[in-house]
Design a protein with these regions (language model features):
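Conserved catalytic Lys-bearing alpha helix of Rossmann-like short-chain dehydrogenase/reductases
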Residues: 14-22
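Conserved Rossmann-fold NAD(P)-dependent oxidoreductase catalytic core, especially the SDR/UDP-sugar
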Residues: 1-14, 33
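Glycine/proline-rich active-site loop of Rossmann-fold NAD(P)-dependent oxidoreductases
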Residues: 42-55, 89-99, 122
Length: 169
């Protein structure tokens, strides 16, 4: 609430609103569970993995001797773990309950080392912390790009700098 994320990011606002609506249906006869899921790894037949976007971003750094990325980190799950959480919540929920689900907590630096090993076989790619102001400047470029294509992003690219710099686990 202090960061006013719902005001800045339509995606976050919609998730909060969805939870509020879902909880209205909970009563003594029907439990309602909301799973608060972080980044999910795995594939879904017929769908492009979300992480393809990250790979495309990292390829922009190929000609540089290092990669710049925010200092923070995030929680992560596998598709299988999400399935297990769904079953557990469905079997156990009473009333209205939100479950924050996580298995792996990694800094962006730790995570990118794994990605580079998988992507290029590079075990020691240098990762440099991107200052928040640089990330915000890139966010302004992205805002202009979105506007030129008449795209409304769910996460404000300038405000994303506040989130990406935090260890969200």
């Amino acid at each position: 609430p202090d960061m006013k994320l719902c005001e800045k990011h339509p995606y976050i606002r919609s998730r909060v609103e969805q939870e509020e609506v879902a909880f209205k249906y909970a009563d003594d006869d029907m439990g309602v569970a909301v799973l608060e899921l972080p980044y999910i790894f795995g594939t879904q037949p017929g769908r492009r993995p979300v992480w393809v976007i990250l790979i495309e971003q990292l390829q922009r750094f190929k000609k540089m001797p290092f990669t710049m990325y925010p200092k923070g980190g995030t929680a992560m799950l596998t598709v299988r773990q999400v399935g297990e959480a769904i079953v557990g919540a469905a079997e156990q929920v009473k009333g209205a309950r939100a479950y924050g689900i996580s298995c792996y907590n990694l800094t962006w630096r730790e995570f990118l080392k794994i990605v580079y090993r998988a992507m290029d076989g590079i075990p020691d790619r240098k990762i440099v912390d991107c200052p928040k102001v640089f990330f915000q400047m890139f966010g302004h470029v992205m805002r202009k790009d979105y506007a030129s294509r008449n795209v409304e992003g769910g996460i404000d690219p300038v405000g994303l700098a506040d989130i990406m710099g935090m260890e969200l686990f």
